[in-house]
């Protein structure tokens, strides 16, 4: 239970960082949120709670840990960032005080209702508005494709690359 581990480490002031990915069978390093978006939301709920309730915990370093074997790596990163933004925005909607009260009174039904209410909220319009206000692309993948960024990078760098492992 990753969100429980995150919560425990945050409350003890020991969570230094977090690698985001998704998996189907073991450590597949799939696009963040592609298989288990609700789990991603629950992890962010734990992060939000931990950041709000333990000033001793250092602000965790976050990293996307994915392997881009099938998809364009930049498109995969954009999809991962979208999933992260969406899960984080939804986690910010959770009424942490009510959730803590429901947990303390063992009201599992209310806990589920509070979490699922936030999870089912469509935050994509808010994320698009935020991007627009900061001068970013409302639809990053569409812009990336329209601007032919991949082709420009290939033209600039070439098709062949060598990984040395260093």
Language-model regions, residue ranges each:
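Histidine-acidic metal/acid-base catalytic patches
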Residues: 1-166
């Amino acid at each position: 239970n990753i969100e429980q581990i995150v919560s425990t480490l945050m409350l003890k002031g020991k969570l230094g960082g977090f690698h985001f990915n998704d998996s189907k069978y073991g450590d597949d390093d799939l696009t963040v949120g592609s298989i288990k978006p609700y789990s991603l939301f629950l992890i962010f709920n734990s992060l939000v709670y931990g950041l709000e309730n333990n000033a001793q915990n250092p602000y965790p370093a976050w990293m996307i840990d994915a392997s881009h074997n099938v998809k364009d790596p930049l498109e995969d990163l954009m999809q991962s960032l979208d999933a992260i933004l969406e899960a984080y925005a939804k986690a910010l909607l959770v009424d942490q005080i009510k959730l803590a009260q429901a947990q303390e009174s063992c009201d599992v039904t209310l806990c589920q209702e509070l979490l699922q209410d936030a999870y089912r909220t469509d935050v994509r319009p808010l994320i698009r508005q935020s991007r627009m206000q900061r001068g970013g692309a409302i639809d990053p993948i569409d812009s990336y494709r329209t601007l032919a960024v991949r082709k420009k990078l290939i033209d600039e760098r070439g098709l062949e690359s060598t990984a040395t492992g260093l």
